[in-house]
Regions:
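Hydrophobic faces of well-ordered beta-strands that scaffold small-molecule active sites
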Residues: 10-18, 46-50, 81-89, 116-119, ...
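N-terminal amphipathic alpha-helix/helix-capping segment at the start of soluble metabolic enzymes
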Residues: 1-24, 76
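Active-site beta->alpha loop and helix N-cap motifs at the rims of alpha/beta catalytic domains
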Residues: 52-169, 173-176, 183-187
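Catalytic cores of alpha/beta
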Residues: 156-168, 213-229
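C-terminal helical cap(s) of enzyme catalytic domains, especially alpha/beta-barrels
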Residues: 239-261
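Terminal or standalone catalytic/regulatory effector modules within metabolic enzymes
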Residues: 35, 41-59, 292-300, 304-453
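Phosphate/diphosphate-binding loops
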Residues: 261-275
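Glycine-rich phosphate-binding active-site loops on the catalytic face of alpha/beta enzymes
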Residues: 120-123, 180, 226-243
């Protein structure tokens, strides 16, 4: 599908991945998806995001599904639509850095089993953490979409993102995605940024946002006027709120204009009817709280904190019986973030900064207690931080420990063969070793049940 200079707008629907990850704790099953696939395949989407992110973990841990089998079945059910996944660079779909051989094999197997487009991101926008995944995507004939984690800070200027986009282009990416995971990108800022990206790079631009702060659809509209090529939306039963703006609304808003998506509204209505039932079940089962996921959270804008991180902080404070410290913690988050060199707040940095802010407030003294993860971040174990850290804080947290400046994965020896030996008794399929590499205990339990051992 070629990218035209302004029209029509191309749509990636997130209904099979980020929509339920954002609204219903990633609990949608393959059974929920399959009845809609035949019609989904006729709509004419640019792509369907259906795999990666938290779905892999959720399949194994909660749904007793093999994520690889889910992908193969979706591939068969959606023969005419590009399938897309979200990959965390060197973290793959786990929560730590993996060796290059594991990253390479994971990308190969994702593409072998039916993925067309791999959107890769890194929480710190450290391109060294994405290099291997992007090279592998290209080597195995996938489409490499590289994401910039969007955030606001004194260092995250338009110039910063333009330079990052140029580096991404030089790296061999096919598309550049602005990944606004917290819904912080405001409409006129989006317009200005996309105009600049269009002027300084030749690659198509994709916008991924959330409606957490109530500004998502406006941001998409301004992005469209600025010439964005593709936007992420979610079908209405799981659209809006903490998810993406609703597909049907964007399609209707652009109908009859030069940006007309050309998507069939009748078909969208049919599919939405099916997913309404799915959303109702997810609500009934307690995985989706409409009041929470659909209410506008303006605090996200005020404190630059993603919606998921807010609920996490509330959980930690309730556990500590310290809800009266909520606003003190919200005010501490930006201070910790500044001390740590302004990391974007997305997995895993959102958890690291949030937990440290809670400890600083509850401990009565800043950095009296420091988590292992905070120390790792300050030591460079997660990659290069966007700005210089507060050296006084670093000294207090890690003393004279050595700070690494090279790519963290350079320290990791090949791991694949070791993992293969460890799960010899289970291997029904080559992909099992990857499930085990990412989530050893969870995968072993799943494989034992599957193989009747």
């Amino acid at each position: 599908m070629e990218f035209l200079s302004n029209k029509p707008l191309l749509i990636t629907d997130t209904i099979l991945r980020d929509a339920h990850q954002s609204q219903a704790a990633t609990r949608m099953t393959l059974e929920d998806m399959l009845p809609a696939c035949e019609v989904l395949d006729k709509v004419g989407y640019y792509s369907l995001e259906c795999w990666g992110g938290a779905t892999f973990d959720s399949c194994l841990r909660f749904l007793n599904e093999d994520p690889w089998e889910r992908l193969r079945i979706l591939r068969k059910a959606l023969p005419n639509t590009k399938l897309q996944m979200l990959l965390r660079g060197q973290n793959i779909l786990g929560y730590k850095h993996y060796a290059d051989d594991v990253v390479d094999y994971f990308v190969k197997k994702s593409i072998d089993n039916g993925i067309d487009i791999i959107r890769t991101f890194d929480a710190l926008n450290d391109l060294r953490n994405m290099e291997k995944a992007v090279k592998a995507t290209k080597a195995y004939n996938g489409t490499a979409e590289v994401a910039m984690s969007y955030t606001t800070s004194p260092v995250h200027t338009e110039e910063y993102f333009v330079k990052l986009a140029q580096d991404i282009e030089a790296m061999g990416a096919d598309l550049i995605c602005i990944k606004d995971m917290a819904g912080l990108l405001l409409p006129f800022n989006a317009y200005s940024l996309i105009k600049k990206l269009k002027a300084h790079t030749k690659l198509p631009i994709v916008l991924h946002t959330h409606n957490t702060a109530g500004t998502g659809a406006m941001t998409i509209l301004k992005a469209v006027e600025a010439g964005v090529d593709v936007v992420d939306t979610a079908l209405s039963p799981l659209g809006g709120g903490t998810s993406q703006p609703a597909t049907e609304s964007i399609v209707a808003a652009l109908k009859g204009t030069e940006y007309d998506t050309g998507l069939d509204e009748e078909l969208l209505a049919q599919i939405a009817e099916h997913f309404r039932g799915v959303a109702e079940r997810l609500t009934k089962d307690g995985w989706r709280d409409p009041d929470k996921v659909l209410s506008v959270n303006a605090k996200a804008l005020q404190y630059q904190v993603p919606g998921g991180m807010l609920s996490n902080l509330i959980g930690q404070l309730k556990q500590a019986n310290a809800m009266d410290k909520y606003y003190a913690v919200l005010e501490e988050v930006p201070r910790v973030r500044k001390d740590f060199g302004y990391p974007p707040l997305v997995t895993p940095t959102s958890q690291i900064v949030g937990t440290q802010a809670v400890m600083n407030v509850l401990g009565g003294e800043r950095y009296k207690m420091v988590t292992k993860e905070s120390k790792g971040l300050l030591k460079g174990e997660y990659g290069r931080l966007p700005a210089p850290v507060n050296e006084e804080v670093r000294k207090k947290c890690i003393g004279d420990d050595k700070v690494i400046t090279h790519r963290p994965a350079d320290d990791i020896a090949p791991e694949l063969e070791g993992y293969r030996k460890e799960i010899r008794q289970y291997s029904q399929q080559e992909e099992d070793v990857l499930s085990y590499a990412l989530f050893p205990q969870v995968a072993e339990k799943f494989l034992a049940i599957r193989d009747g051992k």
